[in-house]
């Protein structure tokens, strides 16, 4: 978390990355890109069953929610990794610290909330096959709580993501469902290279439904606050 916070504090201009990405509107661009991709993927037809992949559950309702400016987090622009997770970190052999970060293909200038929700997704996507027996946060002694992660990030980064987490969590789940829908589409066309593609494809709907449940939770909270 501290490494992520330090990364987000880097001024793009100070390292020659002022043209690395647009300084604002990150989530708007993500919504546009992923909704377009999802619509295309939904049209893929299985070569054997002739059944289309189909639209994600509550797709248009979810898009409308994320596109609603009154529900979106305050716009921010920092360097973002795009796939920040433990798998993409190199740790020191004997010391508890990160010494390298891998896989920068999706890096850009964007909203720091996206990286935070990506890294901490196992805390809120339990029940969608996103967690493993080896990592059950809040259950296995010694593993930090998400509140601890927020505190470590806030102390170094100077920004508290807590108010925006429900929205960010919902968006991450929706984004992930579209990525899995892509696996499903490639499997339907028998173009998927992974032997586990069919199993991954089965997770598309559960993740889309998980996103929708989180969207409804945010909507209910905002109704109670009189913002919707």
Question: In which residue ranges do the predicted regions lie?
Answer:
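All-alpha amphipathic helical-bundle segments outside canonical DNA-binding/catalytic cores
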Residues: 22, 160-172
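Catalytic-loop of the protein kinase fold
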Residues: 79-81, 86
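Hydrophobic residue at the +6 position relative to the catalytic HRD Asp in the kinase catalytic loop
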Residues: 89-91
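Active-site beta-strand-loop-beta-strand hairpin of nuclease catalytic cores
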Residues: 93-97
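Pre-DFG segment of protein kinase catalytic domains
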Residues: 100-103
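Active-site activation/catalytic loop segments of kinase-like enzymes and analogous catalytic loops
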Residues: 114-157, 172-190
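Regulatory N- and C-terminal appendages and interdomain linkers associated
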Residues: 182, 186-228
């Amino acid at each position: 978390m501290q490494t992520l916070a330090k990364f987000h504090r880097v001024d793009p201009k100070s390292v020659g990355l002022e043209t690395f990405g647009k300084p604002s509107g990150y989530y708007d661009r993500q919504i546009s890109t992923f909704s377009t991709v999802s619509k295309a993927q939904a049209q893929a037809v299985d070569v054997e069953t002739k059944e289309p992949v189909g639209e994600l559950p509550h797709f248009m309702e979810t898009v409308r929610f994320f596109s609603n400016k009154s529900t979106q987090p305050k716009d921010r622009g920092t360097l973002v990794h795009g796939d920040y997770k433990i798998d993409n970190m190199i740790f020191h052999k004997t010391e508890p610290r990160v010494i390298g970060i891998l896989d920068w293909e999706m890096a850009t200038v964007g909203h720091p909330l996206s990286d935070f929700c990506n890294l901490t997704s196992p805390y809120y996507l339990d029940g969608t096959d996103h967690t493993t027996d080896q990592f059950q946060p809040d259950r296995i002694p010694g593993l930090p709580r998400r509140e601890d992660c927020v505190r470590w990030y806030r102390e170094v980064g100077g920004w508290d993501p807590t108010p925006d987490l429900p929205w960010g969590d919902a968006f991450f789940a929706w984004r992930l469902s579209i990525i899995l829908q892509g696996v499903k589409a490639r499997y339907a066309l028998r173009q998927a290279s992974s032997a586990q593609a069919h199993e991954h494809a089965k997770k598309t709907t559960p993740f889309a439904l998980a996103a929708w449940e989180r969207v409804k939770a945010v909507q209910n909270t905002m109704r109670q606050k009189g913002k919707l």
